[in-house]
């Protein structure tokens, strides 16, 4: 039974914002997405890091990567195209330079890792097993598979295999971040669930491009890139809803979240937590603003806890099909 709504602005008792993502426990559902928050240090002048539900720092790889040629980012009418190419200093530098600061920031650190193949994911997970300050791993499985020439995240069996491989070397909670650039997101999420993931993060960016028609040139050095921001929110919501309807695995929703209303849409659709991404570039204090507004929004629904509203979307009753010829006859 759904909680009884209350008028906006009405007083409410304290709301429980705690989140469980499999074995990962978070104090609240507001996380910041990989690649949009640096390694946390860059945002200390804007956000009290310790108040966040979690920080997902920039993705790391086994060895340093220089990333793609410029231009790497292009602003669009309703978002941002990026083609960074996983530019990072590698895991050794991360452990030496970045993790000590993150460990002391007060928020759970969910380390984002990416490999060119399953072996590299396993290698990274093994290195991070037992490292103080690492709360969980997020697998960025939208990177090219060198061995097979396809994306690991677009094949359900490869997704299952990568997650299972990681699961075999670590007891850390594992989140699988999935690409929307597939025909059946549920099948990929099922692969992650069967592999042993604690949760899935939905979604990564959508493929897109931008063109300078006067110069007849692409605006990104890599030609195509990943689209993020408000333009992809409807796609992200659809993916969250579809996975929630079919699977029991917890979901972290991400894609175009700019306001508390956006967060609430994801919660009702089935996400247990959210990640803020592109909004961090436009409004570095957004995570604080949104987190502060969630209790009142939950109060409007009469909810005593976040869990009371997750996955409570009320679907319309299915209507019986009507013969098209009969419908046409009535239309005249």
Question: In which residue ranges do the predicted regions lie?
Answer:
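Alpha-helical scaffold segments in soluble metabolic enzymes
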Residues: 45, 93, 123, 161, ...
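Short gly/pro/ser/thr-enriched loop/turn and capping motifs at secondary-structure boundaries
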Residues: 61-66, 144-146, 207-210, 281-283
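Active-site metal-binding loops of divalent metal-dependent hydrolases
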Residues: 35-36, 255-257
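Alpha/beta catalytic cores of nucleotide-metabolism and tRNA/nucleoside-modifying enzymes
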Residues: 1-13, 227-248, 252, 258-332
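Short low-complexity, flexible loop/linker segments enriched in glycine and/or proline
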Residues: 70-72, 215-218, 289-292
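N-terminal capping/small domains of soluble enzymes
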Residues: 1-109, 115
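Alpha/beta enzyme core
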Residues: 116-252, 258-269, 276
């Amino acid at each position: 039974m759904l909680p009884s709504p209350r008028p906006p602005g009405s007083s409410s008792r304290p709301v429980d914002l705690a989140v469980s993502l499999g074995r990962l426990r978070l104090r609240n559902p507001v996380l910041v997405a990989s690649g949009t928050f640096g390694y946390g240090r860059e945002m200390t002048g804007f956000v009290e890091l310790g108040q966040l539900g979690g920080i997902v720092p920039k993705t790391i790889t086994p060895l340093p990567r220089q990333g793609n040629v410029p231009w790497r980012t292009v602003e669009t009418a309703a978002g941002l195209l990026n083609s960074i190419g996983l530019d990072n200093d590698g895991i050794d530098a991360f452990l030496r330079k970045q993790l000590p600061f993150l460990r002391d920031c007060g928020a759970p650190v969910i380390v984002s890792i990416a490999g060119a193949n399953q072996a590299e994911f396993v290698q990274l997970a093994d290195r991070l097993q037992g490292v103080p300050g690492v709360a969980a791993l997020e697998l960025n499985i939208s990177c090219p598979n060198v061995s097979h020439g396809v994306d690991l995240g677009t094949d359900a069996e490869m997704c299952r295999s990568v997650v299972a491989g990681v699961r075999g070397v670590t007891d850390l909670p594992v989140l699988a971040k999935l690409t929307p650039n597939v025909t059946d997101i549920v099948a990929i999420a099922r692969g992650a669930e069967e592999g042993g993931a604690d949760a899935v993060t939905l979604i990564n960016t959508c493929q897109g491009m931008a063109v300078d028609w006067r110069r007849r040139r692409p605006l990104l050095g890599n030609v195509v890139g990943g689209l993020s921001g408000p333009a992809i929110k409807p796609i992200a919501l659809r993916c969250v809803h579809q996975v929630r309807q079919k699977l029991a695995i917890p979901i972290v929703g991400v894609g175009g979240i700019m306001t508390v209303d956006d967060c609430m849409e994801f919660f009702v659709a089935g996400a247990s937590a959210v990640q803020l991404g592109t909004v961090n570039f436009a409004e570095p204090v957004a995570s604080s603003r949104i987190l502060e507004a969630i209790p009142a929004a939950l109060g409007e629904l009469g909810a005593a806890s976040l869990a009371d509203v997750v996955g409570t979307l009320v679907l319309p009753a299915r209507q019986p099909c009507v013969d098209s010829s009969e419908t046409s006859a009535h239309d005249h």
